[in-house]
């Protein structure tokens, strides 16, 4: 497997958007992610209420969408899962992410409500040999996962064992 570049920059509220642009350059984003493919942005909503450092912040979503639009990406899907503890629609609202999507003419898509299809294991051996279900929206798409560095309630117990 080809090694990919990793980039880290110190940022500030004043330089955040230009820093994200620079990070994409350092990570050779344009060599890897292409505007002529469907692009899925995997948003991270850990809790439906707003807790700083817990979910995708609006400025991160805004910065990546700004860069995608600048690069003429058209087919963009902003998605998140439905979980037993999180209502993603409420989370999109309380975390101010809907406002960002509206700014770029996009809407939120809940993966649980979209179509699903069977993935043949010969397509991706990482997951084992049995068939797996996958959201239809990610078939043939490039996925950008918006990372959130955080602790989880299980981490203390898991790391202590």
Regions found by a protein language model. Give the residues of each.
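N-terminal and secondary-structure boundary signal
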Residues: 1-161
